[in-house]
């Protein structure tokens, strides 16, 4: 009987310690953020899912439309979330709010730079050129490794160095 009482007392003490100290919640548990509605990283790149996207001054339909994008698959950067709304930035630095349903996780980028950009057959500077692009061409991103991204443009796949693309971060890797 004495062993059972000791066991119950020790169990109760351990229960109180775990409850009062917050054990089981994780030492680095992230607190709920009312501005975040997903667990995806912020900032992150996405693309427009529709050929007509209203950009508003705030996160809701009650806010006036600032402008309208008419380019499906245009890359944009999500810089803030509020409920179903996303604050985005485009390649020119323009910022506004769009409904999350008008965005897609499919990755696109835009070629940038002052010179002609070469799309190569392999992720190497000495690789055979496949295409030459001017700035402002939209490309589908398939994967990014180190300093290269595998892209598709005009039904041709190849590799472009990340520093010639807007729509991917310098250290970002994905496939």
Predicted segment positions?
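SH3-family beta-barrel domains
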Residues: 27-57, 68-72, 79-94, 98-121, ...
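A subset of signal/propeptide-processing and intrinsically disordered low-complexity segments
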Residues: 4, 23-25, 121
């Amino acid at each position: 009987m004495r062993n059972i009482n000791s066991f119950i007392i020790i169990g109760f003490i351990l229960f109180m310690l775990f409850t009062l100290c917050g054990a089981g919640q994780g030492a680095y548990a992230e607190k709920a953020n009312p501005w975040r509605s997903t667990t995806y990283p912020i900032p992150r790149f996405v693309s427009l899912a529709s050929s007509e996207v209203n950009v508003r001054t705030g996160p809701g339909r009650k806010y006036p439309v600032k402008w309208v994008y008419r380019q499906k698959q245009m890359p944009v950067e999500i810089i803030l979330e509020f409920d179903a709304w996303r604050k985005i930035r485009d390649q020119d630095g323009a910022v506004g709010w769009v409904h999350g349903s008008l965005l897609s996780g499919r990755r696109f980028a835009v070629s940038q730079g002052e010179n002609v950009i070469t799309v190569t057959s392999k992720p190497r500077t000495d690789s055979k050129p496949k295409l030459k692009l001017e700035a402002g061409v939209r490309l589908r991103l398939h994967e990014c490794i180190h300093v290269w991204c595998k892209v598709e443009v005009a039904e041709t796949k190849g590799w472009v160095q990340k520093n010639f693309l807007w729509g991917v971060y310098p250290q970002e890797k994905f496939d």
